[in-house]
Structures are given as structure tokens and as C-alpha cells.
Amino acid sequence: MTARRNNSVEQARQAAIEVLLHNLHGPYHGLPRTAGWGYPEPYTRDLLIAGLGALACGHPKLTESLRRVLETLARNQTHHGHIPSLVHDREDRGASDTTPLFLLLLAMYRRVAGEPDFLESPAVRALTWMDYQAPSDHVMVAQLPTSDWRD
């Protein structure tokens, strides 16, 4: 890679980190906001996808923020393991991708943090919920019209 491209990549990386840091404190229970200049709500899908960037850059404030998001999701998880669509609202359910995203980011966070048992009980409940989302028992989770994306 040329020096010019290297510089462009580094500038993009720094800009992304600045956005993530800007979004650290939103108006809902000290959780990050979804979009710094748009949606203040802590949408699970968006924050977990942003969590990939938080873990990749290794910034301690971003890693700690992801931990808070995961802990809040675990507290707001349904008895059967479904993860809500809004991090802070246990009644906002219906998304089919929030629970698998929770499991993915939880596994990655555990590895980065060196905490293999972090949120073990919520992880087991989430896996149980996932099992019941595969009607044919062939591991593949169903995407039914009633559990479709709402945006």
C-alpha cells in the first residue's frame, strides 16, 4: 500500500473512532446513542454492529461502553432469551437479528476481555431462544414475515 493510501486509511480510522467516542453518552440511561447527529435511541442492532468497531480499535472507553450495552441487554432479555430491539426497553421486541448479534458480540467481547464466562446465564438463555427459532430443527433460524425488520 502506498504512503498516500496508508494515510487515507488512517484518517478514516481516526474519523470512525471519533464518531464512536462522540456517541458514547446518549440520553437513555447512560447508554451510547445510535447515531451522533440523528437517532439518539440505543438501537440494539446498530450498537452491536458498532461494537465490532469498538473491539477492532481496542479503545478502552469503547470496550467498556460495549460491556455496558451487553450487560443492559442481558438485564432486559426476556425469560426465554430474546434480546430487545432497543437496549433499554425490555418490551420492544420483534427483531429476529438482535439475539444472534448479541451472541456474536458477547463471544467476541469475552475473547478480547479474557472473560470466558461473562454473562454465561444470559448467553444460555439466548441460545435456547435461538433453538426455538429453527422450526425445522436443522439449525437454520427462520425469518418469518411477523418477525421481519421493522425499519
Language model features with spans:
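Low-complexity, Ser/Thr/Pro/Gly-enriched N-terminal "stalk/linker" regions
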Residues: 1-42, 65-68
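Short alpha-helical segments and helix-capping/turn motifs at coil-helix boundaries
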Residues: 35-36, 49-52
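Aromatic-rich carbohydrate-recognition surfaces in CAZymes
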Residues: 41-47, 54-144
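A short, charged helix-loop
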Residues: 146-151
